[in-house]
Every structure is written in structure tokens, then in C-alpha cells.
Amino acid sequence: MKRLPFLLLCLVLLTGCSTKKNTSGSRFWHSFTARFNTYHNGSEAYKEGMIAKETGNKDNYTEMLPFFMIGNTKSAQLGASNFETAITKCEKAIHLHSIKKKPVLSANKTRSPKTKAYLQRKEFNPFLKHAWLLMGRAQYQKGDFVAAASTFSYITRLYAAEPIVANEARLWMARSYTAMDWYYDAEDALGRALRDTIPSSLRQTLNDTQADLFLSQGKYEEAVPLLQKAAKAERRKLPKARLYFLLGQVHRELGHKQEAYKALRKCLKQNPPYELAFNARILQTEVLADAKTARKMVSRLQRMARSNNNKDYLDQVYYAMGNIYMAQNDTARAIGAYEKGRQKGTRSGIEKGVLLLRLAGIYWEQTDYEKAQKCYAEALGMIDKEYDGYADIARRSKILDELVPYTSAVRLQDSLLWLSTT
């Protein structure tokens, strides 16, 4: 009986804090509970997912790196279970703590413009915007871009009376559209966001979203200043090194050799993991190689080939060497370098696959179809079906598989005929 008053008090408080009522007390209670219970757990799960994605990510340095790691197909599912937990927690927070009912105000009280704007809101729990945004980000990082775009689109309508929240959602909506190659929709979302003044808290989000879009569209000139800003703003060493490597790749694509070299040097200054540092040094030799420096760059690569630290990367070393020779129109030496990479490379991944494709292309141009067929057949087992031009490569390989028995027979007959006449 002594506990009855306490239980009655708790019952009264809980009744007063129903989401069907909109009072200062109910808003405080549901904001506090959402933040420090379900949302907190979801936020921690999201952080763990991001750590798993960053530590487990494996970039393909033979291609232009995606701005965001979610762009790597093989890394897309890293941290997926953590992001799913974050989504579930956010959904629970929204379900339990959303306050849609408008507050009751005195009919005689004069309503200021601020009060009128407040009453235009569709969600009155002041903290739930964080749960909505976290849910959308978790869907994006999980790779469910359609769901993410849908969530962010809903946020722009739900928080139309709060421009900062709506614009943050538009920026993430643009990222989601970019990830699906829906560039028109991404540009439209960005355009809508830019109609309002972007606060300083969202400037970097805007910068990175635009950089990702320009890179995905192949607009490298426009992407350069945004990449520079992103790399400079990044404080963590590994992501910073990765962005400088990407900047080096972009400058190389644009023919800006000195700028590419400087960006790669900044990448190396971050003391990145060995594989990233190795690829940065490889790319440095390629961007600096010209008629005057080609021999020096080849010598540098030969020293790298002799280093025991690089024994697992010999396919890349000789691939870079072959590329330098090809740039000097020395096809014979290029073939020699590529063949060495083919023989000495111990891996069976995309790096060796790219080397084999380059070698196969040369043999194809020289009408040496037997060698081309072997290179294409071997390369197909090392590249993914998502590789650019995979369908054409597979078709050419199939043609050669059918053609080579006949060309081999013709060559044999020619050899026998030659022997019979000597």
C-alpha cells in the first residue's frame, strides 16, 4: 500500500507524456527518451558499421577510385548488419516518440510570425529529425539507395518548415541518386538545396556531394577544386591519403602531370598502408615518364621489382613499366615488360587481369590471335562482370576461342609447306 502513491504518480506522468498530447512536458519527455535510448543505440551501431567499412575497404587502384567507399562493389556490404541495427533503432524511436498533434494555444493570444511558422511543422518532437536523418544515412551506407532516397525525400516534406533539416536531406538524397547513376535527379536535388543559404555545418557535406557527382559524371575539371577542399578538410590520415590519391588520378586523367605528382606526394606524406603507398609510387613513375625521364622512371621501377617487399606486386610493377614503354611507342619492350608481369605476378586478381587485357589488346592489333586468345581467356577469370567493357571482352574472347583452332591449323600447314620446300 505504501508504494501505491508512487505508482499512481508514475501512471499520471506516463499518461501526460502520451504522443497524443503536445505539451512542453510531453515534448521534453519523448525527446529525452528517444535520444538517450533507441537513438543512442542506433547511433553507436552506425559508428561501428562505418569503422567496419573503412577498415575492411579494399580499393581497386587500376581504376579511378570512387569518392565514397560505398562506391566499391566489393566493400558495399561491409558493416551491413550494423547499419540494419541502426535502421531498426531509428524506426523504433520514430514509432514510439513521434508527436504529430499540434499544441493547444490560447485563442486570445496573438500569434507571432515565429509561432505561426512553428505551427506549420508536421513533427513536434524536436529530436526526431536526427533519427530520420540517421536512418537515411544507414540505408545509404548499407547500399539500399532506393530506400535511402525515399527516406530523404520524405524528410524534405516532413521538415519543409525547417530548411536546414530539409536541405541536409536533399544533399543526402543527391548522393543516393548519384550512387544509382540518376544524375538528373541528383542535380535537381542539389539545385533545390542551393536555393537556400547553406549553413556552415553543411558546407563540407555539400562539397563532398558535388565532388562525388562530378566524378561520377566524368566532369574532372569541375571535381578538382572540390577534391582539394575535401582532402584538406579531412583530418584522419587514411581517408586523407585516399583522397589525395584520387586527386592524383584525376590530374593524371586531365594530363596535369606535375599536379598529379604533387597530389601523390601528399598522399605518401600521410604514411598510408603499404598497398596504397605502393600504388601511389607506381603512379608517380607513370605521370613523370616522358621522353627525357622514361629511362629514369624505368630504372626506379626495376629497383622496386628487385625489392622483396614488392614480391606480391610484380604484376603492377611490370605493368607500369610496360605503360611507360607504350607511351614512348616502344611496343617490343612494352610486350616484354607485360610478359614479365604475367610470368612473375603471383596474384590472380584484378591487377593481373588488367595487365593481361592490355597485352591481349596488343596481340589482337598485331593479329597474333593465338597469344591474344590465351591472354583474354586468362584475364576473364580475374575480372568481375561489372568491369567496364566486360561484355565486349567476353565476346572477343569467345570469337578467338572459335577462330584460333583454324588459324593454328593454317599456321601449321604453312610451316609444313615451308619445311617441304627447303
Residue ranges and their predicted role:
Residues 16-422:
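Acidic, polar-rich low-complexity tracts and alpha-helical solenoid repeat scaffolds
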Residues 4-13:
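Sec-dependent N-terminal signal peptides
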